[in-house]
Amino acid sequence: MELTLWTYEGPPHVGAMRIASSMEGVHYVLHAPQGDTYADLLFTMIERRGRRPPVTYTTFQARDLGGDTAELVKGHLHEAVERFNPEALLVGESCTAELIQDQPGSLASGMGFNMPVVGIELPAYSKKENWGASETFYQLVRGILSKQPSEQSGVSHSPAAWKSQGRRPRVNLLGPTLLGFRCRDDILELEKLLNQHGIDVHVVAPLEARPADLMRLPNADLNVCLYPEIAEATCLWLERNYGMPFSKTVPIGVGATKDFLEELHQLLEMPAPNPGEGAEQSRLPWYSQSVDSNYLTGKRVFIFGDGTHALAAARIADQELGFKVVGLGTYSREMARPVRAAAKELGLEALISDDYLAVEAAMAEAAPELVLGTQMERHSAKRLGIPCAVISTPMHVQDVPARYSPQMGWEGANVIFDSWVHPLMMGLEEHLIGMFRHDFEFVDGHQSHLGHLGGHQSQTEQQQSQAATNPSTQSNADSSSEESPLWTPEGEAELAKIPFFVRGKVRRNTEKYARQAGCRCIDSETVYDAKVHFRA
């Protein structure tokens, strides 16, 4: 066990809460002490939900440990069923309750409830949140479909059956959850995209799905695995038991969306899509080619996040924006293999770690010009003075925008371009700031319009204060002022030839050079010598 002030993932029961909260008609009874109820805030504060998660806590206390905590569990199960009347009941335990070994799932299964009861055993001390969400979704789908008498294990499932049935092909979108990164907007974008290609969305799960919707999953022609961390285990089970194929490409970025559509059309035996659709529908390809080449090309970028978004970001950065990827990693150990493979293709060694300090150290060593990461990478990048864009959970409330802001599909590519490029400085802007960095507008001690309320002293005030307390400082300043070199008419004429927006910097640099060289007068030759000196 490690003491830390930040974690990329919560314990697995938080993942189970994400599944229960994402769905309708599902209730989760969690055997947990009072302190584990903190997870409610993740949904009401971060996700800005208008209602609490559908979770009942047993909230046992220390004094309860001397009695029969199993009876406490049964009491809360009865209360939850009577009060909420769920269509499906999830039962599990938190990391603390796991030590008591009450096995609440087994208790609930023997209580004769008239709805599906799914007990979830999540190893809290070896697995984490995303695995818990994946396992919960898998167990819920398996538990509900196993109640169907029509289940035929190993039955052949033809993705092209829609042709003989005289209907449009239909697919399931699996994996979006609450506390996922822009999942709700991704679904809207994909529904629109698939409809344009003549494909219907049959079921979206777990987000906003009901248990009855899960029973309809096998009626689709294939499954779309949008977030492998959450849905891959379920897709594999549906493939084994119902013969349902599933897509492997996550449509984040122009190239990936193009590959995604080609994969779907091939699986569904539909005509190939228009290969030029990406350039027609998304602005990213043209924008990335039309901007100042110094703006994007060769920018060093460090990428860290969940496996799905880190892999997508690496492809977009390398192939679509012309960035140079100098770091790639993930905290999702379940996605370590594909991330390592992607890093190897880029000539890198992947960083697989859930230690934010190790990530910050790798970031500092890579010295990128842009960081693409989670909320913690935003903090680390700020400490290092590096621009950052958040591409993955865990995220802050500001990364749950009110506007429509998908990551997938053609519009998602537009959003990604804006999100990644805005933290960077334009080439001309960067050049001008470099030239004017020492001008008074950029001096840290520049007087604020709120200066009368207190705050930092101006540079002049600081010098006067120092001079008042240290007479030698005043005399040194006077002598320095007396020794300032004089500009000859020839030197002033040469200075006038320099563009106005850099003239101040050239004047200061020339005077600095003249003092160092011991020149009492500045003529045209001194200006040229200073220019050579500061360029060297």
From Swiss-Prot:
<comment type="pathway">
    <text>Porphyrin-containing compound metabolism; chlorophyll biosynthesis (light-independent).</text>
</comment>
<keyword id="KW-0067">ATP-binding</keyword>
<feature type="active site" description="Proton donor">
    <location>
        <position position="292"/>
    </location>
</feature>
<dbReference type="GO" id="GO:0005524">
    <property type="term" value="F:ATP binding"/>
</dbReference>
<comment type="function">
    <text>Component of the dark-operative protochlorophyllide reductase (DPOR) that uses Mg-ATP and reduced ferredoxin to reduce ring D of protochlorophyllide (Pchlide) to form chlorophyllide a (Chlide). This reaction is light-independent. The NB-protein (ChlN-ChlB) is the catalytic component of the complex.</text>
</comment>
<dbReference type="GO" id="GO:0046872">
    <property type="term" value="F:metal ion binding"/>
</dbReference>
<comment type="subunit">
    <text>Protochlorophyllide reductase is composed of three subunits; ChlL, ChlN and ChlB. Forms a heterotetramer of two ChlB and two ChlN subunits.</text>
</comment>
<dbReference type="Pfam" id="PF00148">
    <property type="entry name" value="Oxidored_nitro"/>
</dbReference>
<feature type="compositionally biased region" description="Polar residues">
    <location>
        <begin position="470"/>
        <end position="483"/>
    </location>
</feature>
<dbReference type="InterPro" id="IPR050152">
    <property type="entry name" value="ChlB/BchB/BchZ"/>
</dbReference>
<feature type="binding site">
    <location>
        <position position="36"/>
    </location>
    <ligand>
        <name>[4Fe-4S] cluster</name>
    </ligand>
</feature>
<keyword id="KW-0411">Iron-sulfur</keyword>
<dbReference type="GO" id="GO:0019685">
    <property type="term" value="P:photosynthesis, dark reaction"/>
</dbReference>
<dbReference type="InterPro" id="IPR042298">
    <property type="entry name" value="P-CP_red_C"/>
</dbReference>
<keyword id="KW-0149">Chlorophyll biosynthesis</keyword>
<dbReference type="Pfam" id="PF08369">
    <property type="entry name" value="PCP_red"/>
</dbReference>
<dbReference type="GO" id="GO:0016636">
    <property type="term" value="F:oxidoreductase activity, acting on the CH-CH group of donors, iron-sulfur protein as acceptor"/>
</dbReference>
<feature type="binding site">
    <location>
        <begin position="427"/>
        <end position="428"/>
    </location>
    <ligand>
        <name>substrate</name>
    </ligand>
</feature>
<keyword id="KW-0004">4Fe-4S</keyword>
<feature type="region of interest" description="Disordered">
    <location>
        <begin position="448"/>
        <end position="489"/>
    </location>
</feature>
<dbReference type="GO" id="GO:0016730">
    <property type="term" value="F:oxidoreductase activity, acting on iron-sulfur proteins as donors"/>
</dbReference>
<protein>
    <recommendedName>
        <fullName>Light-independent protochlorophyllide reductase subunit B</fullName>
        <ecNumber>1.3.7.7</ecNumber>
    </recommendedName>
</protein>
<comment type="similarity">
    <text>Belongs to the ChlB/BchB/BchZ family.</text>
</comment>
<dbReference type="GO" id="GO:0051539">
    <property type="term" value="F:4 iron, 4 sulfur cluster binding"/>
</dbReference>
<dbReference type="InterPro" id="IPR013580">
    <property type="entry name" value="LI-POR_suB-like_C"/>
</dbReference>
<dbReference type="InterPro" id="IPR005969">
    <property type="entry name" value="Protochl_reductB"/>
</dbReference>
<dbReference type="InterPro" id="IPR000510">
    <property type="entry name" value="Nase/OxRdtase_comp1"/>
</dbReference>
<keyword id="KW-0547">Nucleotide-binding</keyword>
<keyword id="KW-0560">Oxidoreductase</keyword>
<keyword id="KW-0602">Photosynthesis</keyword>
<keyword id="KW-0479">Metal-binding</keyword>
<feature type="compositionally biased region" description="Low complexity">
    <location>
        <begin position="448"/>
        <end position="469"/>
    </location>
</feature>
<keyword id="KW-0408">Iron</keyword>
<dbReference type="GO" id="GO:0036068">
    <property type="term" value="P:light-independent chlorophyll biosynthetic process"/>
</dbReference>
<dbReference type="InterPro" id="IPR016209">
    <property type="entry name" value="Protochlorophyllide_Rdtase"/>
</dbReference>
